[in-house]
From Swiss-Prot:
Residues 838-866 form a coiled coil. Its main location: nucleus. PANTHER family: PROTEIN STRAWBERRY NOTCH HOMOLOG 1 (PTHR12706:SF8), STRAWBERRY NOTCH-RELATED (PTHR12706). GO terms for cellular component: nucleus. It is found in: Nucleus. Belongs to the SBNO family. Pfam families: AAA_34 (PF13872), Helicase_C_4 (PF13871), SBNO (PF25373). The lineage of its organism: Eukaryota, Metazoa, Chordata, Craniata, Vertebrata. This is Protein strawberry notch homolog 1. Plays a crucial role in the regulation of neural stem cells (NSCs) proliferation. Enhances the phosphorylation of GSK3B through the PI3K-Akt signaling pathway, thereby upregulating the Wnt/beta-catenin signaling pathway and promoting the proliferation of NSCs. Residues 814-837 have a biased composition (Low complexity). Residues 684-837 are annotated as: Disordered. Residues 778-790 have a biased composition (Basic residues). The gene is SBNO1.
Amino acid sequence: MVEPGQDLLLAALSESGISPNDLFDIDSPDVVLATPTPAVQQSVPLSALDLGLETEAPAAVKQEPETVSTPALLNVRQPPSTTTFVLNQINQLPTLGTTIVMTKTTPVTTTRQTITVAKIIQTSTTTRPSVAAPAVRNALTTAPSKDQIQLKDLLKNNSLNELMKLKPPPNIAQPVATAATDLSNGAVKKEASTKEVARIWINDVKMRSFSPTMKVPAVKEEEEPEEEDEEEMGHAETYAEYMPIKLKIGLRHPDPVVETSSLSSVTPPDVWYQTSISEETIDNGWLSALQLEAITYAAQQHETFLPNGDRAGFLIGDGAGVGKGRTIAGIIYENYLLGRKRAVWFSVSNDLKYDAERDLRDIGAKNILVHSLNKFKYGKISSKHNGSVKKGVIFATYSSLIGESQSGGKYKTRLKQLLHWCGEDFDGVIVFDECHKAKNLCPVGSSKPTKTGLAVLELQNKLPKARVVYASATGASEPRNMAYMNRLGIWGEGTPFREFSDFIQAVERRGVGAMEIVAMDMKLRGMYIARQLSFSGVTFKIDEVLLSQEYVKMYNKSVKLWVSARERFQQAADLIDAEQRMKKSMWGQFWSAHQRFFKYLCIASKVKRVVQLAREEIKNGKCVVIGLQSTGEARTLEALEEGGGELNDFVSTAKGVFQSLIEKHFPAPDRKKLFSLLGIDLTAQSNNNSPRDSPCKENKIKKRKGEEVSREAKKARKTGGLAGSSSDESESESDASDNEESDNESSRFLSSGDDDDFNPFRDESSEDDEDDPWLIRKEHKKVKEKKKKKSIDPDSIQSALLASGLGSKRPSCFTSTVGTTTSSTNASANSNTNSSFVTSQDAVERAQQMKKELLDKLEKLAEDLPPNTLDELIDELGGPENVAEMTGRKGRVVSNDDGSISYESRSELDVPVEILNITEKQRFMDGDKNIAIISEAASSGISLQADRRAKNQRRRVHMTLELPWSADRAIQQFGRTHRSNQVTAPEYVFLISELAGEQRFASIVAKRLESLGALTHGDRRATETRDLSRFNFDNKYGRNALEIVMKSIVNLDSPMVSPPPDFPGDFFKDVRQGLIGVGLINVEDRSGILTLDKDYNNIGKFLNRILGMEVHQQNALFQYFSDTLNAVIQNAKKNGRYDMGILDLGSGDEKVRKADVKKFLTPGYSTSGHVELYTISVERGMSWDEATKIWAEQTGPDDGFYLSLQIRNNKKTAILVKEVNPKKKLFWYTDQILGNNSN
């Protein structure tokens, strides 16, 4: 649609010999071209033009019979606006015979006149030849004179210096241009920039567009600042202050609470449920208004049933610190008052039982008792030997849910105990607090669902009438982790998604936008609520740590060691002819250790900086919380065992990782260990010294040593160890949980290699106690059975050898020992025993030699490797007496007064081990210690904020030394210091080293936070304010950029950007060699041709593997990748295809028009609701009035209007270019249609 003020430019373009068809689609019914309506001013000398004036009716335009009307001269269909300008300021004067309609406005009347140009008089000192033309022709057919310079020709010649001759000459007064504009086309908002709105093209509305690939000659494209505008705008509009809309009871929450703008746009269902909670609780504010709202909607949802007959559940997605615990206590209290006196409450730690009791007590439910499940003996909970517990709350951890008694019996599992206590018709409350712990029910790749997830699902299926509540700030960082939330009714019988897999495919295929819709839909149905504390006052900062020269040298030495190790692993595996399955296991362990090793180096580089910052903050009157994920206790215990219980120095965790890998997983079989495991007496055979026996001696197959593994697992078990009960039963349950989780993680890692979800730093050490893949796994036999067994079944031996990859070529080597094979087998085997013996014996010795060489290299490097981060931090910050440690480990290495190093237990005489973390927390909150170090074990439920009720009210500075590997744990850690009822909001400091690979971990967290904010809070922008989104590479743009990078390095594609200019050497050659060293580029053995790894465009794998490259290489490669990614994103934005998620339309100068609305009824749940689909059109851009004002003020030689070279929708686009910096040739341009202001 054309603004009334467009007539000025159209007239000028027409006079210049340019057809308006170049600008507009004349056939469009929506485009009405305005007639130029100049009003003659007193300042115009009448002698300048010999004008013939004739009065005519306003509705008609007088034309010569033979004249073809120009589009610029079409009559206006509406009352024209008034435009005033000086005629002689048009540089290109009209040709003879041109007819111009003039409108002259007086206070009384408006008259229209037709001006026919009969004569041209030059008034300037420079004479200009007159142009004679008998009639006006269409601009498309008229051949202009030499003096008429056409804009089209100038642009075709790419000559910006030839200015479009529409600019006023410098010796003439500036033109005056006014035009009335109509802004009635829809609501126009002025709050935000137009750059947020995506292009929406509607078929019935023809809109003019600016070609995204248009290039202005001689204008160097700079990085466009509009990206920053978008981000700032997104931050400003991400949250809306929250107050319950449809529930008017309760007092205001003590702290400001917000909701994402996406969720706030959806209203929850009407409230019809009446709560039974006492007025005293409500009036005293023991439950705030928003907590009462959650209780009411949960109880209301519990009154409905899903199509499959199960009672509907409710999901509380409130952020950390809002008060989910008190809300859950309120739901239990509400049901208790209605006669449902039994409830089950699951959480992640037994420590949180005390918080549950506190929450119930605080809301006035003192008579509801809380019992720990792991304190009960196996058997009926209501029996006498369990205290005849028949009502109250049973508090259990997820690990105890899968606990099992070894003694047997009818109720030998905790799950059966619970099911019996509840009963088949149980309609009480089951709460899954911190329910992200039940994730991974839906397996990825070849992994298996976790036992925890299966148990949670079974409990819900066995109790269909139970009132289920899911509660977690991180309920589902990915939709795949929602598999256990089957009570939400999103999938299943009677819903659009028959199976959960159907739901997953639909959501994941559509990306983050679909997850936002899922959250909004759940709120609309009344099954979901998500609020979080306002982040006002919270500061976020990313502190990049510089690396010292000594550190870089140590790092590069480590890289060379790992490159050498990779070659040795490959050579040794080929020497012993290992099977493919065993190779896969070997490489899985190798790359897992590779990632852990360099992760520990990355963390170690930041210790000095953290200590420095911590000391500064303490001096400034603040207190410090340092977040870690791994404690490295397993390596400490291994070193302690090797040293006979004594230590000479702090243990190097990195060294322990590499040493454990070589000793347990290097493919160099130990034949003595093999035969001892198989029960074969080698000494009895040694006297024969027969060649046919020798091949068997080099075979090494492993089985699990039951006693040893059990002992090591108990030693190394850390997470949850301090949270468990002192009873034997709870200990065994905790062990079972750890083994179950870690076994699943291990299998998942082996199946997917470098999957981002794999946690290489989990506290359980069972991964390092995994069986050597070169040894078979064998069930534990009792000692008595071993003594009785005189012979070995040859089939079992052969299968064991086959499992190790050693039995296929030498199947008969055990014939003399076993004595049960046939004579024909003996004969066939003896025919080639000599050659087989020589080859295999030599291979094993060479493999053993390689193993020894690697261990020797490690010892040389070990002097430079950093010590355990946690021990070093505590030592540097003043020792255990000054630092409150809240981790899962049981002991630590300390520096004594005499300078010696020793290992000591964390337990204290007056503090039971099960409440050690709670005691340390209290010391921190009381101000006895001003520094706290928390690990994952303390990341759930523990409150460390500057609480008004605590003695220590210093401002918290939360330093994240080690970014959690998943968003679940990141949110939990961030929420420890930002909670309700705090005096001051915390400061967050994220320490990231300048190592390129280090940003890999920030990338994963950023990805998870983005997805997390989208799903659990309905808006992906909810997590952008955490200042980590700039490290998010794992998206479609990142994968596209990585594909371009990898292909350009192996010369399969041309580079999109130039390599870093400061790289010393041949960038592509050096980086190619580095990527070969980390396995991302393969070299064919025979041809030497370079091929890319099958997962070459996997962002996680790429950023993980480049950790193993030298510092300058990985930094340069990462810079090259980042530059390519920026180019990819810029192209996507210019093409209008950049995914910006849910956005607000009409927030700037856009004109939004509603074209159509369709309503759809939403099936799958009983509550009424519908979905509305709006079809709208959005028009954006600068008005012609604004454009002409800017045009009038131009002074630069290259300023003016330009046309795009490319045609889109059969139209060209005009842009206004203004010179900003003549020296740098920096220009400001405005796309008239899209309104993009760029430099």
